[in-house]
Structure formats: C-alpha cells, structure tokens
C-alpha cells in the first residue's frame, strides 16, 4: 500500500494473521465433535454424543470467557504484541497436542488453547483499532474492520477443505497438526508486519476511578474459580454433568458483580445498563441454538444426511482428497445401534457389538447400496461447517447494502429492532430442520443435503442481524467508565449461550422424535423474540436518546 492509501499498511498483515488464526481454530472445531465420537478403531475417542457435546459446549464457553481477562492483562501490563504472540504460540501448541490420542493430552490441549485464545483474540482487534486512530485513516475504520472480519470468514471457509484433505489422506492427528501449523504461520505473519504497528502498541493506563472496579472484578473472577471448583467436585450432579455444575456455579459471583455495577449507576445510566443487560440475557438463547452447528447439526450431517458425492465430482474430489471413501458395503464388527444411531447396551451398561454394515447404511435407501465390498463416495462431514462462513461472505455485503438503503431513507431499524429480526429469522431456520425431519419420516431415510444448506443460509441472515450489533450496542450505550466491563458482559452472555448449546446437544439422543428437538429450539427462539418485542418500545427509547 502506498503512503496515500486509505488504510494503514498494518491492516494487511493483521488481516492475514487473523485469517490463519481462524483457519486453525475452525479447522479444529470442524472436526472436534467428530473426533470425539468416531470409533476408536477409526482413530477417534469413541465417546457417546452426550459426553462429546458436554466437552464441546464447555470448551467453546471457556473460549469466550478468557479474552476479557487477556485484554485487561494486555492493557495493564503485557502489551498487545507480546500478548498476541504468546496467545498464538499457545494455541498452535494446543492444536498440535490434540494429535496425541490420550485423554491427558486432549484435555491439556484444550486448556492451553483456552488460555492462548484469551491472550490473542481481544488484542489483535485492539491493535487494529489503534492503527485507525490516526486521523489519516479514521474515516475508513468501519471499512477496515469489515475487511478484517471478512478475512475471518475466508479462513473459516477454506479450513474445512484442508481438514478433510489431512484427515482422509493422513489421519486425524495430521489434521490437528495442520491447524497448529496454520496458527504458527499466523504468528510469523504477525512478526513480519511488526514494523507497521509496533508504534501503536501503547498500553492504556487505567483511569484512577477505574482501578478499584477492575481490581474488584479480578477478585470476583478468583472467587468464581472457587465456586466453579465447588460445583465440579460436589457429589453427584445438579445440572447433568460436573462441567455444567462447575460452569454455572462459577457464573454466580460474576452475575452478582454485574448486579452491583447496575446498582452503582445513576438513574440515567441505569436505563442504558439495564437495556444492555436485557439484551445480554436474550442473546444467550440465540447463541445456544446457533452453536448447535458443531454438535447436533454435525450429527445430523453425519448420520441423517445423504452425503453421496455427485458422480460428476467424484474423480476430481478423490484426486483432491475431498471424497470420503471410508464407508464400505461389507459386514464388519460394529456397535449395535438403534434406529437413531444410539448404542444398544447390555444389562451391565456396556455397548453391544454385532456383525453388520457400517452405521451410515442404517437409513440409506436400498437402491443406493453399492455392490458388496464396494466403497461409497461421500461428502466429508466437516465440509458442512463451511456453509455458514460461505453465506457470511456472500450475504454480508447484501445485508450492509440493505441497511444502507434504509438509512438513506431514514428507515433503518434500531439496534434492538435488528436483534429482534435476527431472533425471528433464526427461529425460522429451525423450522427448516423440522420440515427435514418430517420429510424423511423422522430419519428413517436420509435427508437431502439441501436441508442443511437452507438451515445454515437462513440462520446466517439472523446472525448478521444480531451478532455485529452486540459490540456496537455496548460502545453506544455503555457509561464510559464501564465500557470494558460491558464488553465483558457481552462475552459472558455468549459464553453462557455456548455452554447451554452443549447442554441442549447433550439431550439429542433423548429425543426419539427428532422434530421435537428442533421444535424446542424454535420455541426458545420465539420466546426470546417475544420478550424483545414486548420490551422493544422501551429499548428503542433508550437507543434513540
């Protein structure tokens, strides 16, 4: 870029750094649930859906908790460049450690990734924002962030094709190593671009009036860890698993802390903070449903969806290792499953084995069976995880243009109204899956892949109406002295939603009629939408002040 460019030179390097970071993260996430549930003889852990969903939900919940702490530490002590470098290296190590199929390595790697994400994620955005504080670039800040976030989704789109390639050709371990290599490439890219942003790595000294609040919050976090330990180690379980008990117990002191923040506000501030708290609570439900893409919808793609590769694509996809040929039409020793792919257990609770075709054949139409001993040519399950980022890339400019069109005519809806629309549209996406279940007679036959494409397409529109509004809302409404804490509140809401997503997915196998699972999702989103509509007039009054 020339010196007269509308954007700082550092944008390109930060965008590519973020591309590689998201590449690694979403590559890992795309195969994470599959890895946990795949039979051990095929390289996975062989866990049941409920355990895998619980681990998945806890992980993505913690991933959204640590960035607030990492951001505070970078602001107060570590600096942004060091934090980004440390976080990137830790995440790369974590991804590579997943290649060791041992539970100690598995859970250690998750902890390392959670900590690394906390250092990396908030600080690269802050560094980018600091670049645009230069008066030369200030007017193009929104465009710069759009380009930056576009890189996120490009990374999220392409990574699943690499995941499929590495898994099919080399195995699960090399797929995770590829995620780690991607993260290390991101760190190297960041360091190559260092001359273009080292001058904006300026720590913000907290204002004297902010320090007591920040220190109080850090003490609350320490107490939350103690509460979490109590929840984890209490005998039996209250909410279905030790991790859920621990997580919800840990939330108690944090939520109490946020209630004291509200009480400390003056009457004018209480209106804004109360509005944010209301929306925080409501979007928890959105995230709980949205994040099912990595668990319940992955299960639906893997077992209930016709993944047969179009015949015209087979030769090319085989050459590129984008065609899964692991399912062969021959009898083998497999776990005995019921009609909904649940393991049948004996009187002692141990899974029963039998001689049968692989599970994929259970609801495959007989006319689609290949000859005995022949392999099927299937779309790799992880590729379905690229549908959402594809729609984000494709639809974001259209949504921006649509709201820009309304803005010019002074008809643009408020942030609260956009969030309401997002909830309603997301609710409609669950009806696509209800229709899919009914059309396939509750999974007795496999569904067309277009049902999942349609579901992801609709919920992506809902996401674009809701997700970008969160941080924008906080920056508009938050009292200046509480902005950082309110950003943390948005992350906390996302984190709780992510954990509840795992709780929902854990119950997938308990639904004999899978339509009822998606009806439950629809009901939850409609309740959230209804609450928003009932409060909309009051919320809009605050936004319009």
Model-assigned labels for residue ranges:
Residues 19, 94, 105-123, 280-281, ...:
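Hydrophobic core of transmembrane alpha-helices in multi-pass small-molecule transporters
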Residues 76-88, 135, 139, 269, ...:
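Cytoplasmic membrane-interface "Motif A"-like loop-to-helix N-cap segments
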Residues 53-74, 121, 159, 386-403, ...:
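Central cavity-lining transmembrane alpha-helices of secondary-active solute carriers
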Residues 33-66, 140-143:
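Extracellular/periplasmic helix-loop-helix junction of adjacent transmembrane segments
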Residues 63, 140-161, 167-168, 175-186, ...:
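Glycine-rich segments within core transmembrane alpha-helices of 12-TM secondary carriers
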Residues 66-96, 100:
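Conserved MFS/SLC helix-loop-helix module at the cytosolic interface between two early adjacent transmembrane helices
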Residues 86-107, 404, 420-444:
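C-terminal ends and interior cores of transmembrane alpha-helices
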């Amino acid at each position: 870029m020339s010196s007269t460019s509308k954007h700082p030179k550092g944008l390109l390097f930060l965008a590519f750094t973020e591309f590689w970071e998201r590449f690694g993260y979403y590559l890992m996430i795309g195969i994470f649930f599959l890895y946990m549930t795949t039979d051990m003889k095929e390289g996975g852990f062989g866990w049941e859906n409920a355990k895998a969903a619980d681990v998945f939900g806890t992980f993505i919940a913690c991933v959204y908790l640590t960035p607030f702490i990492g951001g505070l530490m970078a602001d107060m002590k570590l600096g942004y460049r060091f934090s980004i470098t440390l976080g990137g290296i830790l995440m790369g190590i974590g991804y590579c450690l997943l290649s060791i199929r041992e539970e100690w390595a598995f859970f250690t790697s998750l902890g390392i990734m959670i900590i690394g994400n906390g250092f990396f994620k908030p600080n690269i955005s802050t560094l980018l924002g600091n670049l645009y504080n230069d008066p030369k670039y200030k007017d193009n800040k929104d465009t710069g962030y759009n380009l930056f976030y576009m890189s996120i989704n490009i990374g999220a789109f392409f990574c699943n094709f690499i995941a499929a390639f590495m898994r099919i050709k080399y195995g699960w371990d090399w797929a995770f190593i590829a995620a780690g290599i991607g993260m290390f490439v991101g760190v190297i890219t960041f360091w190559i671009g260092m001359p273009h942003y080292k001058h904006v790595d300026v720590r913000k000294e907290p204002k004297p009036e902010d320090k007591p609040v920040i220190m109080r919050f850090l003490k609350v976090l320490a107490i939350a860890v103690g509460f979490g330990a109590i929840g984890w180690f209490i005998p039996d379980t209250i909410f279905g698993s030790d991790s859920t008990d621990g997580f919800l117990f840990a939330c108690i002191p944090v939520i109490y802390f946020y209630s004291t923040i509200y009480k400390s506000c003056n009457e004018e501030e209480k209106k804004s903070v109360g509005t944010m708290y209301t929306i925080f609570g409501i979007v928890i439900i959105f995230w709980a449903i949205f994040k099912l893409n990595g668990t319940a919808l992955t299960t639906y793609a893997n077992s209930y969806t016709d993944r047969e590769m179009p015949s015209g694509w087979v030769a090319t996809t085989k050459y590129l290792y984008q065609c899964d040929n692991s399912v062969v039409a021959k009898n083998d020793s497999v776990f005995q499953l019921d009609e909904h792919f649940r393991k049948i257990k004996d009187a002692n609770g141990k899974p029963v084995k039998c001689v049968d075709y692989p599970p994929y054949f259970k609801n495959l139409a007989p006319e689609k069976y290949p000859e005995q001993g022949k392999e099927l040519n299937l779309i790799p399950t992880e590729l379905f995880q690229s549908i959402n980022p594809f729609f984000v890339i494709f639809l974001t400019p259209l949504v921006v243009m649509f709201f820009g069109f309304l803005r010019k005519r002074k008809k643009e809806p408020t942030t609260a109204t956009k969030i309401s629309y997002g909830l309603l549209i997301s609710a409609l996406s669950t009806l696509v899956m209800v229709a899919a279940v009914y059309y396939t007679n509750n999974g007795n036959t496999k569904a067309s892949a277009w049902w999942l494409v349609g579901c992801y397409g609709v919920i992506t529109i809902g996401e674009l109406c809701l997700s970008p509004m969160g941080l924008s809302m906080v920056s508009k409404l938050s009292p200046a002295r509480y902005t950082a804490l309110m950003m943390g509140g948005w992350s906390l809401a996302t984190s709780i939603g992510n954990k509840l997503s795992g709780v929902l997915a854990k119950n997938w196998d308990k639904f004999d009629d899978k339509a009822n699972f998606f009806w439950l999702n629809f009901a939850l989103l409609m309740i959230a939408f209804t609450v928003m509509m009932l409060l909309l007039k009051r919320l809009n009054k605050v936004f319009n002040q």
